[in-house]
Swiss-Prot record:
PROSITE patterns on file: MTTASE_N, MTTASE_RADICAL, RADICAL_SAM, TRAM
Domain Radical SAM core: 136-373
GO molecular function, one term: aspartic acid methylthiotransferase activity
Gene3D superfamilies listed in its UniProt record: Methylthiotransferase, N-terminal domain, Nucleic acid-binding proteins, tm_1862 like domain
Domain MTTase N-terminal: 8-118
Cofactor note: Binds 2 [4Fe-4S] clusters. One cluster is coordinated with 3 cysteines and an exchangeable S-adenosyl-L-methionine.
Annotated coiled-coil segments of the chain: none
Classification of source organism: Bacteria, Pseudomonadati, Pseudomonadota, Gammaproteobacteria, Enterobacterales
Name this polypeptide is given: Ribosomal protein uS12 methylthiotransferase RimO
Cofactor field: [4Fe-4S] cluster
InterPro entries reported in the protein's UniProt record: Elp3/MiaA/NifB-like_rSAM, Methylthiotransferase, Methylthiotransferase_CS, Methylthiotransferase_N, Methylthiotransferase_N_sf, NA-bd_OB-fold, Ribosomal_uS12_MeSTrfase_RimO, rSAM
Annotated GO biological process: tRNA modification
Residues reported in the UniProt entry to bind [4Fe-4S] cluster 1: 17, 53, 82
Length: 441
């Protein structure tokens, strides 16, 4: 007599930032552990989960469209993620959604799945789920989320209203996860959160334990511990608090990657105040100079907003002057977009769309020139490159200065004798505004 039973199948759509991706990985890991199959097609699935983003209006629209598509193609849909914090907004457009939960509501999502698609008979000891869990990234790099939520109340952002105040993960749990990832073949760990440099603030930097050893719950201690794993460690979403200075020597010593992703947002003191952002431009420029003196290889990435309510031509010019002085390596720029529930919506002197567009173009033109000059300095030098893709034409990878998906690439034309995850030494032969070309040494 056969014991084979139907294995329930779940479809999954993951939208938004790397932090959302980590939430998706956690839900998928739990589902696979319980014996559910995860399928890539709506019509094969018994139910679909949509993990949404709600950060800006375009993300809300994309999430609503994804929910609509899942409903049309399948009919049984559970919604989670940031937009899930605004249940009324979803129900107004899609009343047939079965259940809605907010972000990081893993247990609720699983309970809803159990209700509509009961758990299969399953022996967890025969599970094929890898020890590091289900990952949605290539196997040689992974995101490591160290905290949830944020204590800032920036006027352009609604993340705290969706994800709550800062909650740091126990440092022992974070380090154990990092060790599992490395044991599974991960060569690069990308540390993420809403506010990485605030890690441990909510628990007063209490002492945790890892492998029986006491470890302080702080960004610097975390970096010191991660450096012992022998893989690339990259820091994202680092607010420029004073103690950030303490990680620069670790970068200079080669313990973690010489890469800082610091969201500065603007350079006009008046606009920063309207944004409820900290920061003195002169102080920030002095720190950047000091950081580069300690760690000459340091790559600085940042993001900025142009066209924020009240931004004058004088304010914008301050931003351009800052770019010229700071000469940042990697920069993203967004035109201010009103987000429902954000305090900035109530500010006077909203900037016309055509002015936002014009300022964005001027900003990008200047930064492209700076980026091209910075990359040109690397021509003729030897750098380390982690390989991401290989085909018959060659390999594509990233240097220590490049995070996946948001930064540039290094092209190794004709280099086919490598595989994803390999770290190779490359001589840089050419550069443009964003990317490098070179040959393996």
């Amino acid at each position: 007599m056969s014991n084979v039973t139907h294995q329930p199948k779940i479809g999954f759509v993951s939208l938004g930032c790397p932090k959302n991706l980590v939430d998706s990985e956690r839900i998928l890991t739990e589902l696979r552990t319980e014996g559910y199959d995860v399928v890539p097609r709506y019509d094969d699935a018994d139910m679909v989960i949509v993990n949404t983003c709600g950060f800006i209006d375009s993300a809300v629209q994309e999430s609503l469209e994804a929910i609509g598509e899942a409903l049309n193609e399948n009919g049984k849909v559970i919604v989670t993620g940031c937009l899930g914090a605004k249940e009324d907004q979803i129900r107004e457009v899609h009343p047939k959604v079965l259940e809605i939960t907010g972000p990081h509501s893993y247990e609720q999502v699983l309970q809803h799945v159990h209700h509509y698609v009961p758990k299969p008979k399953h022996n967890p000891f025969l599970s094929l789920v890898p020890e590091q869990g289900v990952k949605l990234t290539p196997r040689h790099y992974a995101y490591l989320k160290i905290s949830e939520g944020c204590n800032h109340r920036c006027t352009f952002c609604i993340i705290p209203s969706m994800r709550g105040d800062l909650v740091s993960r126990p440092i022992g749990d974070v380090l154990s996860e990092a060790k599992r990832l490395v044991d599974a073949g991960v060569k690069e760990i990308l540390v993420i959160s809403q506010d990485t440099s605030a890690y441990g603030v909510d628990v007063k930097h209490r002492t945790g334990f890892h492998n029986g050893e006491p470890v302080k719950t702080s960004m610097v201690s975390l970096c010191e511990q991660l450096s012992k794993l022998g893989v690339w460690t990259r820091l994202h979403y680092v607010y420029p608090y004073p103690h950030v200075d303490d990680v620069i020597p670790l970068m200079a010593e080669g313990k973690i990657l010489p890469y800082l992703d610091i969201p500065l947002q603007h350079a006009s003191p008046r606009i920063l105040k309207l944004m409820k952002r900290p920061g003195s431009v002169d102080r920030q420029l002095a720190r950047i100079k000091q950081w580069r003196e300690i760690c000459p290889e340091l790559t600085l990435r940042s993001t900025f907003i142009v066209g924020f309510p009240g931004e004058t031509e004088e304010d914008f010019q301050m931003l351009l002057d800052f770019l010229k002085e700071a000469r940042l390596d990697r920069v993203g720029c967004f035109k201010y977009s009103p987000v429902e529930g954000a305090g900035a919506n109530e500010l006077p002197d909203q900037v016309p769309e055509e002015v936002k567009e014009e300022r964005w173009n001027r900003f990008m033109q200047l930064q492209q020139q700076i980026s091209a000059e910075r990359l040109q300095e690397k021509v003729g030098r030897e750098i380390l490159v982690i390989v991401d893709e290989v085909d018959e034409e060659g390999a594509i990878g990233r240097s220590m200065a490049d995070a996946p998906e948001i930064d540039g690439a290094v092209y190794l034309n004709g280099e086919t004798n490598v595989k994803p995850g390999d770290i190779v030494r490359v001589k840089v032969e050419n550069a443009d505004e964003y990317d490098l070309w070179g040959s393996r040494v």
